[in-house]
C-alpha cells in the first residue's frame, strides 16, 4: 500500500520495512541467537538422490511461476503493468491490485526462503540472511531485469542466480574473505547496470 497508494519508491519502502523488521527482531531476541526450530523443519537438510530439498523447492517454484507468468492472464497483466503502468491503466487493468498481488507473492516467497534458511541453520539470528539481499538484487540485474523496472523475465533471473552462485562458490574456493565477496558482487551489479544503460543509449 505504501508503494501503490502513497507512491513511495519501491526501494525506499523495502529499506523501511527492512529496518522495521530488523529493529523488531533485535528487540525480541536482544541481539542473541535464540529460539528453537521444530524438528519438522529438519527436512530441509535432507535430500533425494543428488537433489536437496531446498533445490527441489526452488525447481518447483520456478516451474510454477514460469507457467503463471507465461501462460495465464495474470502473468500477461503483470508484464503489461511492468512495461507501462499508464498504458495498462488506460486499457482497463487494475494496476493497484496487480501490484499488490505481485508484492504479496514476493512476500510469500520471502517467507518460504526464511523458513528454509531457519531450518537449515537451526536457530534464529538477525544476521542469518546478511548479504542475501545483495545476492537477490545482483541475480535479478545480471539476469537482465532493469534496475528501475519495466524489463526482465524469470528465465533471465534463473540464469542470474546460477551466475551469482557460481561466482560465490569461486570466491570461497579462492579463500577470499566476506568483505571481498561483497566488493566483487557490488562490482558485478555496477557492471550489469552500466551495460544495460549503454545498451539503452545505443537502442
Which ranges hold each PLM region?
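Transmembrane-helix boundary motif in ABC transporter permease subunits
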Residues: 1-7, 156
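Helix-loop interface residues and adjacent transmembrane-helix termini in multi-pass membrane transporters
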Residues: 5-7, 71, 97, 148-151, ...
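Transmembrane helix-bundle core of multi-pass membrane transporters
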Residues: 6-74, 98-101, 120-129, 180
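Hydrophobic core segments of alpha-helical transmembrane domains in multi-pass membrane transport
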Residues: 18-25, 57-68, 103-114, 140-145, ...
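Cytosolic-side transmembrane-helix boundaries in multi-pass membrane proteins
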Residues: 63, 90, 94-97, 167-203
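Short cytoplasmic-facing helical segments at TM-TM junctions of multi-pass membrane proteins
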Residues: 74-99
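Transmembrane alpha-helices
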Residues: 94-118, 130, 134
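Transmembrane alpha-helical segments in multi-pass inner-membrane proteins
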Residues: 110, 121-186
